[in-house]
């Protein structure tokens, strides 16, 4: 190692040094050898990193909402129940919160259009409309109606911002004791009904 020092002529308070390290031996890679399990270790580390990355990606997608492609086939469109109530033996098990004004007007349009399409006299519009499909003719009418009624497949954040996260939670189901469970088995089967029109 060689050393070079210099004192500044202007001020003798400090001095600086250069140290030069001479490489007597060149760097050799002969002693480097891969571990025999390095491929296995690399595979598992890569898999762990990929799983953690996908966990964060899916978490972000569930928070922001993934874009849904438009379905070409009308029969493939999902049927959504909005404002539905479940009645079990005359008691109300749960109900959803009332609809916002804009979505209420969409469902008024839905009801009026359905009134024009229907030919059955015994169908009831509004409260008490059964969610279950009665016969094949009703299913054909629903497919025809759903193909002509196009609901946009996105959520407008301005309308939904007035509702909090807790507004979408269902109330807790009732506690059923052993004596009541026998009564429910013998009672009428549960049916769903729409509760759409609220003023």
From Swiss-Prot:
The chain crosses the membrane at residues 39-59. It is found in: Cell membrane; Endoplasmic reticulum membrane. GO terms for molecular function: corticotropin hormone receptor binding; signaling receptor regulator activity; type 1 melanocortin receptor binding; type 3 melanocortin receptor binding; type 4 melanocortin receptor binding; type 5 melanocortin receptor binding. Pfam families: MRAP. Glycans are attached at residue 6. GO terms for cellular component: cytoplasm; endoplasmic reticulum; endoplasmic reticulum membrane; Golgi apparatus; perinuclear region of cytoplasm; plasma membrane. Keywords: Cell membrane, Endoplasmic reticulum, Glycoprotein, Membrane, Transmembrane, Transmembrane helix. GO terms for biological process: energy homeostasis; energy reserve metabolic process; positive regulation of adenylate cyclase-activating G protein-coupled receptor signaling pathway; protein localization to plasma membrane; regulation of adenylate cyclase-activating G protein-coupled receptor signaling pathway; response to starvation. Its main location: membrane. It comes from the Eukaryota. It is a single-pass membrane protein. Expressed in adult brain. InterPro entries: MRAP (IPR028111). Belongs to the MRAP family. Interacts with mc4r. PANTHER family: MELANOCORTIN-2 RECEPTOR ACCESSORY PROTEIN 2. Two paralogs of MRAP2 are present in zebrafish: mrap2a, which plays a role during larval development and mrap2b, which constitutes the ortholog of mammalian MRAP2. Activator of melanocortin receptor 4 (mc4r), a receptor involved in energy homeostasis. Plays a role after larval development in the control of energy homeostasis and body weight regulation by increasing ligand-sensitivity of mc4r and mc4r-mediated generation of cAMP once the zebrafish begins feeding, increasing the capacity for regulated feeding and growth. This is Melanocortin-2 receptor accessory protein 2B.
């Amino acid at each position: 190692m060689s050393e070079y020092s210099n004192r500044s002529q202007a001020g003798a308070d400090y001095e600086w040094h250069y140290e030069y390290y001479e490489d007597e031996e060149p760097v050799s890679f002969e002693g480097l050898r891969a571990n025999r399990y390095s491929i296995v270790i690399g595979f598992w580390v890569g898999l762990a990193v990929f799983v953690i990355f996908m966990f964060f990606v899916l978490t972000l997608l569930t928070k922001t909402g993934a874009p849904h492609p438009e379905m070409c086939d009308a029969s493939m469109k999902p049927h959504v129940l909005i404002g539905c109530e479940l009645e079990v033996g005359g008691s109300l098990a749960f109900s959803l919160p009332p609809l916002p004004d804009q979505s209420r007007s969409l469902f008024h349009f839905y009801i009026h259009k359905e009134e024009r399409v229907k030919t059955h006299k015994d169908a009831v519009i509004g409260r008490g409309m059964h969610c279950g499909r009665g016969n094949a003719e009703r299913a054909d009418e629903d497919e025809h109606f759903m193909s002509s009624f196009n609901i946009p497949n996105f959520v407008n954040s301005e309308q939904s911002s007035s509702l909090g996260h807790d507004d979408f939670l269902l109330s807790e189901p009732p506690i059923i004791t052993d004596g009541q469970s026998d009564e429910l088995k013998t009672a009428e089967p549960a049916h769903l009904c729409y509760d759409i029109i609220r003023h």
